[in-house]
């Protein structure tokens, strides 16, 4: 159910509804499930009053959208960014519900956060904000109820402050947050999980659609947007495998490398971002050019693999056309809803045209590695044990392979297209239908629709 002025949520709902149409035509009883699943189970909105370093009271809006618990405790990140509003959090929680279903783990869907901006704030100000935020949120979360995590603006520092506040308020040490430090309940591979998982998913896509562009070849050219956690570890995994990364970006522009990034340079980017710096300051390095106000997609003449990793709606229709002209074969979202609806239409039309077309993977499938390892962190916490890096990475690879297989099968069966050997199935339809069926069936079994 869309309220007025919720464009992001409307976009996510429209995408799901369109993808589900062939399935709903064949199974009309599920139309009632769609009507009900789009309404969050609970929406929490509260004020967050905190003291800045000058002793002045500041106020922000706090939110938690507890979207769906049919498959397990609500699970989804906390976003701290000035753009945060209810429409964005409803869209993210809605997407999270079906993304979590695709991991095969027992997790429901949720999302939360605040319009607080951690940029430019001191550690003390962030700590005071986090303690105030948790002062309300703690009533509504817990390891078997709702398990938040990090997101944009919420890194290890913020998770630590939030965990500490909860521990003081509840007087208990539980796994009620994921993304924790390794010495106090965190999991190996969690920081890397979204980026690594994206590449594990993309490797399956490449093997089926365009093995000539495998990631063990330096001649395979990869464009990545963003420069935060997702983009950094996506780039590091691509470089480790042997392909060439040509771009990163931030909110002010894009940094393009003619010869390709190195692991050392990505680590330099990570250090810069920890200090709140801009990629523009690295443009003087040899072979790196900064383009203010532009995203990477129109700046590179040849791209084989495009991986949006910044934020929602970061690939427009015009940029999608530019990617087609650059020869792109795979577009997989590291960000949530990274492509606009018009851009997705262009990619899907290219896929339907046959050999040489673009194969597009939506974020709910391709970037589910992050929440998958959050689920593995929950499992480790519940058993009071810690798995090794190799164990977690192996489980992540298995989850991404299973997710790819589920999406491929459902896309083949329910896309409503007359597929031939030359036309690839729609992973967009596959992800939406497979995730929806799993959630809807659980809801029906629990009496949420009939």
From Swiss-Prot:
InterPro entries: Aminoacid_DH-like_N_sf, Glu/Leu/Phe/Val/Trp_DH, Glu/Leu/Phe/Val/Trp_DH_C, Glu/Leu/Phe/Val/Trp_DH_dimer, Glu/Leu/Phe/Val_DH_AS, Glu_DH, Glu_Leu_Phe_Val_DH, NAD(P)-bd_dom_sf
SUPFAM superfamilies given in the database record: Aminoacid dehydrogenase-like, N-terminal domain (SSF53223), NAD(P)-binding Rossmann-fold domains (SSF51735)
Keywords assigned: NADP, Oxidoreductase
Entry protein name: NADP-specific glutamate dehydrogenase
Protein origin, superkingdom: Eukaryota
UniProt catalytic activity: L-glutamate + NADP(+) + H2O = 2-oxoglutarate + NH4(+) + NADPH + H(+)
Enzymatic class: oxidoreductase
Any one of the GO CC terms: cytosol
Active-site feature positions: 111
Family: Belongs to the Glu/Leu/Phe/Val dehydrogenases family.
GO BP terms in the entry: glutamate biosynthetic process
Annotated GO MF terms: glutamate dehydrogenase (NADP+) activity
Keyword Glycosyltransferase: no
Subunit structure: Homohexamer.
Entry EC number(s): 1.4.1.4
């Amino acid at each position: 159910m869309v309220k007025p002025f919720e464009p992001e949520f409307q976009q996510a709902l429209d995408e799901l509804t369109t993808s589900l149409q062939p399935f709903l035509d064949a199974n009309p009883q599920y139309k009632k499930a769609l009507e009900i699943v789009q309404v969050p189970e609970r929406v929490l909105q509260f004020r967050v009053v905190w003291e800045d370093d000058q002793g002045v009271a500041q106020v922000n809006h706090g939110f938690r959208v507890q979207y769906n618990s049919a498959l397990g405790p609500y699970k989804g990140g906390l976003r701290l960014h000035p753009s945060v509003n209810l429409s964005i959090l409803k869209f993210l929680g809605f997407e999270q519900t079906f993304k979590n279903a695709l991991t095969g783990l027992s997790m429901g869907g949720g999302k939360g956060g605040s319009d607080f901006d951690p940029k430019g704030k001191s550690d003390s100000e962030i700590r005071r904000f986090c303690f105030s935020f948790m002062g309300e949120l703690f009533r509504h979360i817990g390891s078997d109820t709702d398990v938040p995590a990090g997101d944009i603006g919420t890194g290890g520092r913020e998770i630590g402050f939030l965990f500490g506040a909860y521990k003081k308020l509840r007087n208990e040490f539980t796994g009620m947050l994921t993304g924790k430090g390794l010495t106090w309940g965190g999991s190996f591979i969690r920081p890397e999980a979204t980026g690594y998982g994206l590449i594990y998913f993309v490797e399956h896509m490449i093997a089926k659609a365009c093995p000539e562009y495998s990631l063990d070849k330096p001649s395979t050219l990869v464009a990545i947007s963003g420069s935060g956690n997702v983009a950094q570890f996506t780039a590091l995994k691509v470089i480790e495998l042997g392909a060439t990364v040509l771009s990163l970006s931030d909110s002010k522009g894009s940094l393009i490398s003619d010869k390709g990034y190195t692991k050392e340079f990505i680590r330099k980017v990570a250090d810069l971002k920890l200090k709140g710096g801009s990629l523009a300051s690295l443009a003087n390095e040899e072979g790196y050019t900064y383009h203010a106000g532009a995203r990477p997609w129109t700046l590179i003449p040849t791209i084989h693999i495009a991986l949006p990793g910044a934020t929602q709606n970061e690939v427009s229709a015009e940029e999608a056309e530019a990617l087609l002209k650059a020869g792109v074969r795979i577009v997989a979202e590291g960000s949530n809803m990274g492509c606009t609806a018009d851009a997705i239409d262009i990619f899907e039309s290219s896929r339907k045209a046959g050999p040489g077309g673009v194969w597009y993977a939506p974020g709910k499938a391709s970037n589910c590695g992050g929440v998958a390892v959050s689920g593995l962190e929950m499992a480790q916490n519940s058993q009071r044990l810690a798995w090794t890096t190799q164990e977690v990475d192996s489980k992540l690879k298995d989850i991404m392979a299973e997710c790819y297989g589920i999406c491929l099968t459902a896309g083949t069966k329910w896309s409503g297209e007359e597929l031939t050997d030359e036309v690839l199935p729609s992973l967009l339809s596959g992800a939406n239908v497979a995730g929806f069926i799993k959630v809807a069936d659980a809801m029906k079994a629990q009496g949420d629709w009939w």
